[in-house]
Amino acid sequence: MSSSSNPPVCSPEKEERSEMKIEIQCMENKQPLAASCSSASEGSGCFFLKSPEIATPATVSSFPRRTSGPMRRAKGGWTPEEDETLRRAVEKYKGKRWKKIAEFFPERTEVQCLHRWQKVLNPELVKGPWTQEEDDKIVELVKKYGPAKWSVIAKSLPGRIGKQCRERWHNHLNPGIRKDAWTVEEESALMNSHRMYGNKWAEIAKVLPGRTDNAIKNHWNSSLKKKLEFYLATGNLPPPASKFIVLKDIADGDRDSKQSSATKPFKDSDSLTQTSSGNTDSNEVGRDHFDSSSALLEEVAASRRIGVNEYACSPVEYKPQLPNLEPISEEVRINSKAYFERSIQRKVENGFGTPKHGNLYYKSPLDYYFPSEADLQHMYGYECGCSPGAASPVSLMTTPCNKDSGLTATRSPESFLREAARTFPNTPSIFRKRRKVVLAAKTDAVVVVNGVVKEVDRKEESKDMRKSLLLETTDNCSDDEELGLNGNAFNLSPPYRLRAKRTAVIKSRQLEFTSEKEKQPDNEIEFTSAKEKQPDNEIKTSEEDKPV
């Protein structure tokens, strides 16, 4: 076979015949039909064609070896300098005398040089994508010659070699190839085979009929390699649809819990396990955990709704932090509570009520109860002999809310009082026009009480002035008015209205509902009107004219 065994006197014709035998042997492509040869690198030949006597050591390679991937049949790769030298040698010998060509490469055989030229460096080699005509031609020739004789088949495809035709058939055109989705059984078999064979995809392909070594390699690197940790920990692969089933069951249970009532939650909770398949123990644990957590959340939400509705639909049992707050007498507190009980009874009859208390309901103390100003005017307007007009329906109650209404924002007692003051009907003109009043000088002031003009010194203590004015004003009320604990009349206005009341008394006009106004003589009324029409400088008394 080799010319090295011939004596030096051998003829050139005999040497050429021996080289032609090597070329014919390689061109007939007598490798096994298994696809294992398709995984070899382009610059390496098949293992039984390599000369072991002159094999290149692994340390001579100029490129670092791969730590993973298919096992190389040939050691070492071709450098760009070697490729250029091979081109010049093939051009010199016209691609025929491969023994002479191999002499340019001390560590390469003639077979390696031939394969490198035919599979990689030949400019006539077509490396582009396959056309439909080429695929049809391969299928037709395979029916004629069978899946063999790839060198003969390649002659009908210009620019293609037998190796390309073989790989195209086994990886794409073979009708026995499975192209559907991978099943769990196939992935488990691939896991077990990979533990035994590693990256030998041709050996793994024997375990998976219908899957090519190329498809097995792509599926392992792209998808299955990420599931390796779970497989090594449990021994099983996670089912693809189990996660969707569990999430669907939880969503269905959440929807059922929203539709169920507070007294009978989760009446359809048994349907959670009817749609789940596989891993029943884990589903049971997840269902129990979901039921308990959802029930707790629903109870907390119901208690919150009850707490807010109680605050909005019931009398405000809150102790406001107001300055100078005087204690309310026992009789006032009892009467005001009776009034609110009647109001609540009317609202319950109209269809509004308070829902039942939940477990998280907080009941504030009932001893500290403060009615609003509008309620006190409604309760004591007739007792003082005054005519308040229409009774104010406004109280410390918010707008009656229905049980089915949503959650409303909480409001402070100050906002209730402010709204009651704005919506109170028949507001006295004193409160509406108090900003137009021109006060007297800082030293003195003219006060008209019951038609009598009085000069009041501003320097005297405010406590004595407030007490005297309060006593004179309460004379207008009926004799059966009830006094407070200290003998003084009970002030119906809140503490922050005390200044407005004092300003109203200083004014030169009387309340419209004063019952004693009709009893005044005509001359006193005229005198009062004249005082009102005078300018401010005439009404005020200068400090110089003041009698000593």
Swiss-Prot record:
A Gene Ontology BP annotation from the UniProt entry: negative regulation of cell population proliferation
Polar residues bias locations: 271-283
Disulfide cross-links: none
GO MF entries: DNA-binding transcription factor activity; sequence-specific DNA binding
Pfam families on file: Myb_DNA-binding
Induction: Slightly induced by ethylene and salicylic acid (SA).
Compositional bias (Basic and acidic residues): 529-548
DNA-binding region: 98-121, 150-173, 201-224
Annotated GO CC locations: nucleus
Phenotype caused by lack of the gene: In double mutant myb3r3 myb3r5 and triple mutant myb3r1 myb3r3 myb3r5, up-regulation of many G2/M-specific genes leading to larger seeds, organs and embryos due to overproliferation and ectopic cell divisions.
Motif (Nuclear localization signal): 86-93
Region: Disordered, residue numbers: 60-80, 256-288, 512-548
Record-annotated HTH myb-type domain positions: 70-121, 122-177, 178-228
Localization terms from the record: Nucleus
Keyword line: DNA-binding, Nucleus, Repeat, Repressor, Transcription, Transcription regulation
Assembly description: Component of a DREAM-like complex which modulates a variety of developmentally regulated genes and of the mitotic genes in proliferating and differentiated cells.
PANTHER family: MYB PROTEIN-RELATED
Main function: Transcription factor that binds 5'-AACGG-3' motifs in gene promoters. Transcription repressor that regulates organ growth. Binds to the promoters of G2/M-specific genes and to E2F target genes to prevent their expression in post-mitotic cells and to restrict the time window of their expression in proliferating cells.
This protein's name: Transcription factor MYB3R-5
Organism from which the protein derives: Arabidopsis thaliana
